[in-house]
Amino acid sequence: VWDWIEGEWQTATRDRLLPGRIVCVASSCGGYDPNRGFDPESKQPVSLVQDVDNNRAAEPSADRAAELADAQHDGEPLSALSQAWKTIACHSREVAHEVHTLAKATGLPPEWQDRLELAAWWHDWGKAHPAFQGSIRGTEAVPRLDRHDLAKAPDQCWSKTNRYRFLDDPNEERPGFRHELASLLGLFALLRARHPWHPALLGPWREVFETMGRPLRLLSDREAVESPPPLLKRLLDCDAKAFDLVAYLVASHHGKVRVGLHAGPKDQDYPARDQRGLPIRGVRNQDELPSVQLVPGEPPIPKVTLTLAPATLGLSFETGASWRERCIGLQDHYGPCALAYLEALLRAADIRASRLDTPDPSLTTEATA
């Protein structure tokens, strides 16, 4: 039985045979007829499926990388697909371009195109998290670039062991880390820092909170007048439903994070050294996303401190409605098929952009300088 959490085959037992599991059975056992499908009465050996590993050279590398990405919960094979160094800003620009092309070709309504493109710009912000950056190590022949905003790197530069160990703290490691969850929580952190009464955050319950006397952080005079980067302004200009859709697409673009935000087995084994609690998919309360540029030519997005409050059920005094409630609202508003369609478009655009070997202009300029 294929174990999606551990990324390996395990002996099949009754408790592991669950709906949706991939089971490997000896072809000599029979039980399958090519004309009728599964047939417990059939004793004829089953024709062998073409061995993917032995025919790797004949298979498109992007398809192979996508399959590997789907086969485990914490792999990043798409990030090594292009064999080139790329920053988050460069990759995000390429994904946004592919999204625009796909959205136009499929005839999406303009407002859906806008939200899909906005999600493309934000989708990989979580790669700035020190756990993801720590997975890029470099080699003696290909040293690591001294940056904290890398999104892509050659295959040989990715750590094969201790995959998500921090660069600046060898004792801190986050097995099972998912960068898209960090991206999602970063969006909530931005609203919380810049506009706590935003309609997508605490706005609908302002009177309730004020009546309860809940202390909420107010913007300083400097923050209130400071002009946000254009990308951040687009996010702040979203209404509640638009923000939730953008956030959902950011979270779901690898199919690993959707409605449920809960700890995995590797999170449960985390050796906590402080009072911040266990991680969820490798992200902990009070983790920081550093200030990075997401759009070439625009000012960087400010540093934020993440909170896991959206994962709790019920109303949060930090982020308002729970993530599960938001997702249920999206399903009621758009329907599951429309959400799946938009998610598929962003994922397709991400895979297309990950194939590109075009040089990153910012790294080319840096190397020239």
Model-derived features with residue positions:
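Acidic/His-rich, divalent-metal-binding segments that scaffold phosphate/diphosphate chemistry
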Residues: 3, 8-166, 188-202, 208-209
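Divalent metal-dependent catalytic cores for phosphoryl transfer on phosphate-bearing substrates
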Residues: 85, 109-365
